[in-house]
Amino acid sequence: MELIPSFSMETWVLLATSLVLLYIYGTYSYGLFKKLGIPGPRPVPYFGSTMAYHKGIPEFDNQCFKKYGKMWGFYEGRQPMLAITDPDIIKTVLVKECYSVFTNRRIFGPMGIMKYAISLAWDEQWKRIRTLLSPAFTSGKLKEMFPIIGQYGDMLVRNLRKEAEKGNPVNMKDMFGAYSMDVITGTAFGVNIDSLNNPHDPFVEHSKNLLRFRPFDPFILSIILFPFLNPVFEILNITLFPKSTVDFFTKSVKKIKESRLTDKQMNRVDLLQLMINSQNSKEIDNHKALSDIELVAQSTIFIFGGYETTSSTLSFIIYELTTHPHVQQKLQEEIDATFPNKAPPTYDALVQMEYLDMVVNETLRMFPIAGRLERVCKKDVEIHGVTIPKGTTVLVPLFVLHNNPELWPEPEEFRPERFSKNNKDSINPYVYLPFGTGPRNCLGMRFAIMNIKLALVRILQNFSFKPCKETQIPLKLYTQGLTQPEQPVILKVVPRGLGPQVEPDFL
């Protein structure tokens, strides 16, 4: 029996030619960084450096930083990726040349209607949407939404008290996840869920479905390996965002909008109502107002961008407070002095709390939820002697930046004092970027910080937190997607004192 098939010469030539063409297709972009004199790991045909992500993106970035220095080039599939850590180059990319060259984030795969979301929209569409949404996140509007969020802070306290009374260790991911879900759905859609006690509510189930992300899913790999298939996926209505979930939110927004217009509920202050008001404002030209599809996309992206980030950040903060009891005590002292006898928090007092701000900032330094900031280069450009070709994705590796011992002495240590008034002014603003910076920074930054601080004040007014045998020490991270604890943070919750158990009526 012959081991080699007896093909004709023409067949062998065709087969050999096909293999050569496939190899060229899978590697033709791989000489870019070598030509530019930029070091980096050797790519694997088709995959680039993607397979090296198996230990997590932060670990990959750290290894590259140690080996190649302040700048390196690599490939995700065939996409050129340039990592930068020099503050001056970061400033140029994120701020100085944002509008002219580095306006857009990378669109990774087919998005469907989500390409209209503020986080994903490009160029003029992004500018228009940002202009329309910015008024919803002013300090005045946040102050108006504060009572709504305050209700969910009270709900968080009640849920924690129930668990504390049982004497069992508490899964903080469940608690903070429910709080985050309730705040986001309450402010983005105006619905009141109590998701901890109603886990099968359609809003809860679809929101969690929206957040499921598997980096090595076959669909994700097909996007990396064969990006030319993206238009085909778009035509077939196959997107990274589950169709059933997007359809649910589309119908929900339509129904809520119709109900509010019918009942003339124009005085609500949630994000959805603010967007509806912008559609009907006489101050906005019709061609500039948000379309209904854009309205759905913004409401949905609020969940995608706000749920996991808030709940994980709260988990990290409470873990650090638990393992640093002197910091927890000092923060409780500031809270008690600012709001005596468990008084209801106020927006104005909350934003003035210095030590609370220090604790939140230091946690975001150690655990940046988005491990990277990305911008796509729109045209060939030279920055500080570095040539960046059109189409290159320029990224800022936040774990590297936030844990560089040259910038942060003993970066693995939790030290809120790094962000004290005396020290804060000495921090280069382009080496601490938990929410990005420049015109395309996170629009919801102040909203997220307000949610986090309000939750911390309410729970630390009422409880202290201690480690238990189920607490993972040291904490390990899951870093394949957004940064979060590998295992849920589980702690012992101890009610504080016998002072008034305030359940403020924010409304």
Curated annotation (Swiss-Prot):
Gene Ontology process terms (BP): oxidative demethylation; steroid metabolic process
EC number: 1.14.14.1
Keywords recorded for this protein, A-Z: Endoplasmic reticulum, Heme, Iron, Membrane, Metal-binding, Microsome, Monooxygenase, Oxidoreductase
Swiss-Prot/TrEMBL catalytic activity: an organic molecule + reduced [NADPH--hemoprotein reductase] + O2 = an alcohol + oxidized [NADPH--hemoprotein reductase] + H2O + H(+)
Domain of life from the UniProt record: Eukaryota
Pfam families, sorted: p450
Membrane topology note: Peripheral membrane protein
Location in or out of the cell: Endoplasmic reticulum membrane; Microsome membrane
GO cellular component, one term: endoplasmic reticulum membrane
Any one GO molecular function term: iron ion binding
Cofactor: heme
Protein task: Cytochromes P450 are a group of heme-thiolate monooxygenases. In liver microsomes, this enzyme is involved in an NADPH-dependent electron transport pathway. It oxidizes a variety of structurally unrelated compounds, including steroids, fatty acids, and xenobiotics.
Family matches, as PANTHER family: CYTOCHROME P450 3A5 (PTHR24302:SF38), CYTOCHROME P450 FAMILY 3 (PTHR24302)
Protein name: Cytochrome P450 3A28
